Amino acid sequence: MTAPSVKSALILVDLQNDFLPGGALAVPHGDEVIPLADELQQRFDLVVATKDWHPADHGSFAANHPGKEPGDRIILDGIEQILWPVHCVQNTHGAEFVPSFDTSRIDHVFHKGTERNIDSYSTFFDNAHRRHTGLAHYLKKRGIKEIYLMGLALDYCVKYSALDARHLGLKTYVIVDGCRGIELRPGDIARALEEMKRAGTILLKNSDI
């Protein structure tokens, strides 16, 4: 068993309407993690959450590039970008937390993907590491040395958050049964898990905490 310490934080990644079944960018079985997110919050002294929070003209949206389709790749502001369906547009229903998700214990919500010309999978930085979300400073100010990540999607936002957390020197756990992946390509989830492990992320299940 791994007991969270007072220097641990639970980070709930992108539990938003557009990422659940029926949403604009649905993660298969994403709804299954909501009860666990509610349960786990009771075990931590600090809980933060993130939201994808895009302007309507965001460069990652295929609809903003005539002739392009979701899944196509372009160069956006100097880095490769996968194009996605329009999702999690600021101040829309799709960008809001799932109604069944208990947000009463969340201490702070961090927004990402707010800049038009660059995406932000990680909860810490944009994809080029040019701007930060404020999460790293928030954790440091509160003496947080380790984090537990869960949410959507495992092979994108959870993975890149874990990699950045390790780069920042945080002891990083990913609660695997609290995540679901998109798996655009077969094997993406397995590759994401392996990449996180190689970076020093500790993979565990809810029952291990």
Task: Kindly give the residue locations of the regions a language model identified.
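Extreme N-terminal starter segment of soluble prokaryotic enzymes
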Residues: 4-10
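A short alpha/beta connector and helix-capping loop motif
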Residues: 6, 22-52
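Short, glycine/acidic-enriched loop or turn micro-motifs at the edges of active sites
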Residues: 17, 55, 115, 154, ...
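Histidine-anchored nucleotide/phosphate-binding helix
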Residues: 37-40, 158-169
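Active-site alpha/beta core segments
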Residues: 38-146
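Short internal beta-strands
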Residues: 48-51, 173-178
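Structural recognition of alpha->loop->beta junctions
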Residues: 82-85, 99-104, 186-209
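Glycine-rich anion-binding loop/nest that anchors nucleotide
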Residues: 144-160, 174-176
